[in-house]
Amino acid sequence: MEKLTILILVATVLLAIQVLVQSDGENPVKGRVKHYAAKRFSALFRGPRECTTKHRRCEKDEECCPNLECKCLTSPDCQSGYKCKP
């Protein structure tokens, strides 16, 4: 997994360099490429997304931390939403 992350990072940087070289000095393209490369770089090293903790609002079970489920707040109609509960 670590090798894949490094490979993706290198590919992103190489693609950014290629676009910069082919852009003929157009500043808007450079700005977009730098922003995209920085965004991908930070996403790769930020790690996995954090989970939703107990008694916080949710929409799906996958959002909740381990051993928690996204359950209805009010049993009859669920109009008030859902929260992560054990």
From Swiss-Prot:
Positions of the propeptide removed during maturation: 24-49
Compartments in which it is found: Secreted
Listed GO MF terms: ion channel inhibitor activity; toxin activity
Keyword Glycoprotein listed: no
Annotated Gene Ontology cellular component terms: extracellular region
Entry domain remark: The cysteine framework is XV (C-C-CC-C-C-C-C).
Signal sequence range: 1-23
Keywords: Disulfide bond, Secreted, Signal, Toxin
Protein name in the entry: Conotoxin Lt15a
Family: Belongs to the conotoxin O2 superfamily.
Domain of life assignment: Eukaryota
Record flagged with keyword Lipoprotein: no
Gene source species: Conus litteratus (Lettered cone)
Distribution of this protein across tissues and organs: Expressed by the venom duct.
Modification after translation: Contains 4 disulfide bonds.
Pfam families: Conotoxin
